């Protein structure tokens, strides 16, 4: 099939590469405009744009798809000229307006990193870890006017591991989901897919803010563990000590915590080779900490450097 791929960040690159390597033809990509990154705040193309350029694929970077904008009108004209059979989408980042939904015979097909209708919205991977799901996956569905409400085309499952961070899980789903997207394109072309409506109660995973990532030490240890992993690497789980904000990496699972179980929530006990923190249930051993303006470091090394007193407590 002739495809126009819509996507922007690194996870979308995996799917795009798999489509390029498939029997389908990617005739153009839609991606977000160049954005300022790095210390110099210089403009850089998206990860998807870079890959497309390497393969000589046309790159379209509209600031908006709305019909009443200059970019929106130009995109409509170009899509009509390209005449795609389908527009696969992975984390594009722009609203696809109603009048564009029927621009191709097979419409727009989104790869979403959850088993819909679970975790509709912007942060399904983080939500599935944070809420303690054991099984998640990826779904391809046809985009309609709702928020991730379209008919399901294909799914694939994945088991969430006890130490998975959001980055770990997203990386796996990007690869398995990329394969699923290729299979979906082939199935649509061959007429072997039967779309089905989403069934069951929907849950929602809204975009995560920095404030959402703050650790509440009064929560049970397993909840804090999931919270930290769900926000690793971004935006990064964090806590405060006095007036300093520190990012906290995934906890250590290397051994048992040999301290009194009544360590108060947030209370810090620095041992020779570990840092233990009280929670609402049992204490946990920190893995890494990132002080302001520094790189992530071993928690025990951090504790030796700041010389914690006996009353030290995370807030």
From Swiss-Prot:
CDD domains associated with the record: FMT_core_Met-tRNA-FMT_N (cd08646), Met_tRNA_FMT_C (cd08704)
Enzyme Commission no: 2.1.2.9
Residues in the signal sequence: none
Family statement: Belongs to the Fmt family.
Database matches in NCBIfam families: fmt
Reported function: Attaches a formyl group to the free amino group of methionyl-tRNA(fMet). The formyl group appears to play a dual role in the initiator identity of N-formylmethionyl-tRNA by promoting its recognition by IF2 and preventing the misappropriation of this tRNA by the elongation apparatus.
Name this protein carries in UniProt: Methionyl-tRNA formyltransferase
Organism: Corynebacterium glutamicum (strain ATCC 13032 / DSM 20300 / JCM 1318 / BCRC 11384 / CCUG 27702 / LMG 3730 / NBRC 12168 / NCIMB 10025 / NRRL B-2784 / 534)
Lineage: Bacteria, Bacillati, Actinomycetota, Actinomycetes, Mycobacteriales
Recorded name of the encoding gene: fmt
